[in-house]
Amino acid sequence: MAAAKTLLEEPPYAKRQKGVKLDTVGFFFLSLWLVCLQIVLDKGNDADWFGSTWICWLTFISCVGGICFLISQIKGKNPLTDLSVMKDRNFFFGTVIQVVLMGVMMASSTILPTMLQSMMGYTSFLSGISMVPRGAGCLVATLFSALFISKIGERKMVFWGLVILGFGGLAFGEINLQISLMNIGFPNFLFGVGMIMAMVPLIELSCRTLRNDQLTNASGVQNLLKNVGAAIGTSLVTTCISRFGQMHQNMMVGKLTELNPAFTERLQSYAMSFVSNTDMASATHMAKNVLYNQLLQQSTLWAYIDTFRLFAIASFLIAPLVLLMKRKNLV
């Protein structure tokens, strides 16, 4: 704090701002919107989302708070945030891309260790080690961006970063329960490279066409929306895994019938392995339990695979938005 106070100073346009007042009404509605939204996102999946009355009420209050906040910022004399920056094309599309990017980044960082621990028996330490290649990818991309951004341009750097991130999601979509840490490393490395290649130039590119006196406000708006995007992304993937798991389970259960030769053969094989310790009826029941547990495991695995593929789709969909952003500085 002492170093910051000593070394940092406010720019001239900030020093000229006098008599700045806090928009208490806007701050109240902002707090109401975000607090209710965060509770809904944190507890929604556990409470069956809109099957719960209190989730519905909190969602309604959050929507009302968000709408009132927007109205207060547009109509107020001293708004908490100046939303006119969203009229800037670079800032608007840059913020949209960053919101989605933060959602993908935080969501993937959340579900990968969970998958490794719950489905593959990894310890917390090993699941943490699995994220090391992502850090290495971030480091490599940081060096690469610094060296080549002036040669290829920010827009191309962001575009190819999102494409690489998408291929990382597709690579995660090929996982199975027999993979090793090495198999996790390559997709994670791609995620790290893609995120940094896209995020670092995008921050500068999105604010390039704004005036100096708009930068502080724009940074606040952008960071707020990125945090909301990260919270929504983390919450959505939890729901996606739950819903996709149920969907795949329902699809697979239809194959567990005596009309399916593969099921019958595997059932008999398991039953014969158990019959030496019990009677045939009990052995058959035990064999069915084993097969059903395998079905649950595979349906959950496919839920994770589908979720990772959604990350890839999201990355590919937002990549063309970079082409709508301007190259030149504001004159």
How does the language model describe each region?
Residues 1-27, 52:
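Helix-loop-helix hairpins in multi-pass membrane proteins, especially solute transporters
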Residues 1-5, 30, 58-62, 306-323:
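Symmetry-related core transmembrane helices of the 12-TM Major Facilitator Superfamily/SLC fold
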Residues 22-27, 34, 38-39, 48-217, ...:
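Transmembrane core module of solute transporters
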Residues 1-12, 72-79, 136-137, 250-266:
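Hydrophobic alpha-helical transmembrane segments
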Residues 41, 116-117, 148-149, 236, ...:
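Interfacial helix-cap and linker-helix signal at transmembrane-aqueous boundaries
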Residues 1-6, 67-71, 170-174, 243, ...:
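Membrane-embedded alpha-helical segments of multi-pass transporters/permeases
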